[in-house]
Amino acid sequence: MSGDSERAVAPGVVPAPCASKVELRLSCRHLLDRDPLTKSDPSVVLLQQAQGQWLQVDRTEVVKSSLHPVFSKVFTVDYYFEGVQKLRFEVYDTHGPSGLTCQDDDFLGGMECTLGQIVAQKKMTRPLLLRFGRNAGKSTITVIAEDISGNNGYVELSFQARKLDDKDLFSKSDPFLELYRVNDDGSEQLVYRTEVVKNNLNPVWEPFKVSLNSLCSCEETRPLKCLVWDYDSRGKHDFIGDFTTTFAEMQKAFEEEQQAQWDCVNAKYKQKKRNYKNSGVVILADLKLHRVHSFLDYIMGGCQIHCTVAIDFTASNGDPRNSCSLHHINPYQPNEYLRALVAVGEVCQDYDSDKRFSALGFGARIPPKYEVSHDFAINFNPEDDECEGIQGVVEAYQNCLPKVQLYGPTNVAPIISKVARMAAAEESTGEASQYYILLILTDGVVTDMSDTREAIVRASHLPMSVIIVGVGNADFTDMQILDGDDGVLRSPRGEPALRDIVQFVPFRELKNASPAALAKCVLAEVPKQVVEYYSHKELPPRSLGAQTGEAAASSAP
């Protein structure tokens, strides 16, 4: 066994937008020995290249006095198939506390690669190189990648032990516990290593969290192996005992007894001693299973996506009778409004059982009094603004154009507030049954920016998302304010949005894209936003709602 740190180890996270998530596990062999009296105390730093610069993002724990360390800390990174993501792993002999600073540490070697290379190989071993490309002796680093995008949550575990064997002459043992997953090929993968509890035969280790994928590859009957050691500062830890179990067994025992325990057995002692029973007892004091639901979990659980379309009828679009107008109807060439409307609508309608769209307009003078309206039904039925399918919206739009006078200004806050009222009514049901998408199609920057920011911040607490597609060639720079990608959107009063619910897309950047590519870009953020909302509200998919009551309290949060 390799060395151990004196601290518990928790997963590290590289912050990034939602994508396929990959866990990286690290180990090294034959490291250089930089310490004259003992072995090196290695740790690994992860760097990621961004805009040509190497940025240090995380670091493993320190493994004491080991030239062949197996690190417990896991790096979680986001993987994009379409991009080249350059990573660098640097190994240091660590002096003092392990933080993100390496200036006092001895460099033992580094390795550069791409995340794609690691993912393609799943397990990659490379030599470590010193400065100027020189080999660091026989030193190697191994990186194992696991896709956790489909994981189904994480578990909190809390272990303690009783009456462990005393391995020390002048004091009591300093125990720590290691939890391993047994892989299909029989190999063992370190999942977690607890902190060391000094001078104690009845240790209580700190609770820890681990993903189900890391723990058991989401297979609850997969064998798990727990080993208990007496810590030695020189890395020569004394084996106390072990036991084998499964996550399913843990759950069953914990639910029945509110506590599960196993004999911690040293096989060598069992063979030699006739009356040997165990080297102590390990107790699972707490188990909490936290299910993490995906977008598809909610959709398949019965959550409906209701889409509202809001179309800009301001005068800046140009007279629809003029072929240069953004609203000009050409039977052979759909205008930008229609292209965006159809591309997004055809995707959304698959998630709504009645396939009905609310279709609204803003910025026009409407009959019969031709007063300016910033919230009117384009079918001119204020009692029922819904249209049958996306084709119904197209027909209502084409029929509406000759009947209205394009005017202004470009105010969208009233429509955002209208959809927010529907979403608020849905929120009060306490179920994950309906999520609202507002698609705003506009040819210019909104003129009621303060009111719009206020409306979006309020809406960020509700089950809704806002997608804004900018059509035409206007300067949409100011619209990026509403998209929270560059920082948290705030209301004029300074209140921050709870979630980033706005996606802004200039249509001209996708003018030559296929409808599928356009829809993919426009709707890219929606699945994440749906999951974020229901996760924040701690609402499971409707089909799982019955499992969240007190009956499941022993194995659910």
UniProtKB/Swiss-Prot annotation:
Of the GO CC terms on this record, one is:
nucleus
Please list the GO biological process terms of this entry.
cellular response to calcium ion
User: Where does it localize?
Assistant: Cytoplasm; Nucleus; Cell membrane
The VWFA domain, residue ranges = 306-505
Q: Which cofactor does it need?
A: Ca(2+)
Which keywords does this chain's UniProt record carry? Calcium, Cell membrane, Cytoplasm, Membrane, Metal-binding, Nucleus, Repeat
Highest taxon above the source species:
Eukaryota
Q: Name one Pfam family in it.
A: Copine
Residue numbers binding Ca(2+) 1: D168, D174, D230, D232
GO MF annotation: an example: metal ion binding
Q: Which SMART domains match?
A: C2 (SM00239), VWA (SM00327)
Task: Just give the chief location class.
Answer: cytoplasm
Annotated binding of Ca(2+) 2, by residue: D168, D230, D232, D238
Domain (C2): give its ranges. 1-128, 135-263
The entry sums up its family as follows: Belongs to the copine family.
The job of this chain, per UniProt, is described as:
Calcium-dependent phospholipid-binding protein that may play a role in calcium-mediated intracellular processes.
Q: What is known of its domains?
A: The C2 domain 1 is not necessary for calcium-mediated translocation and association to the plasma membrane. The C2 domain 2 is necessary for calcium-mediated translocation and association to the plasma membrane.
Recorded protein name is Copine-7
Species: Mus musculus
